[in-house]
Swiss-Prot record:
Designated name of the protein: Large ribosomal subunit protein uL14
GO cellular component entries: cytosolic large ribosomal subunit
Keywords of this entry: Ribonucleoprotein, Ribosomal protein, RNA-binding, rRNA-binding
Claim: Acyltransferase is one of the keywords in the record: no
Organism encoding this protein: Gloeobacter violaceus (strain ATCC 29082 / PCC 7421)
Amino acid sequence: MIQQQSRLSVADNTGARELLCIRVLGSTVGSKGLTKGGGNRRYAFVGDIVVAVVKDAAPNMGVKKSEVVRAVVVRTRQAIRRDNGMVIRFDDNAAVIIDKNGNPRGTRVFGPVARELREKNFTKIISLAPEVL
């Protein structure tokens, strides 16, 4: 459950280490890139898109500190309840930085990601992830 002012770790190799959520979009990726989402949602869950500020970044990499980016939430500490009764939760809140078309800006994804990303058409992130839970 991510809301404004939530801090997220970054699960890709764009150079950012930490993000600060400034807006929850909650939209999904369609065939023509990102669709407009409601800008009035309070919480973001796995698979939702947030607008965030890079709070910590490695030098000489793809993103810089204080840059405003879009990211998709891939892990949350809040438990995810599935239709079959399974409950899954992660140790951290993490996101992957994406471009305007919904494709990841990095070339690698670190750590496990939730299967719910497949339902929201983030198949590129699923294919880059080492483990899908």
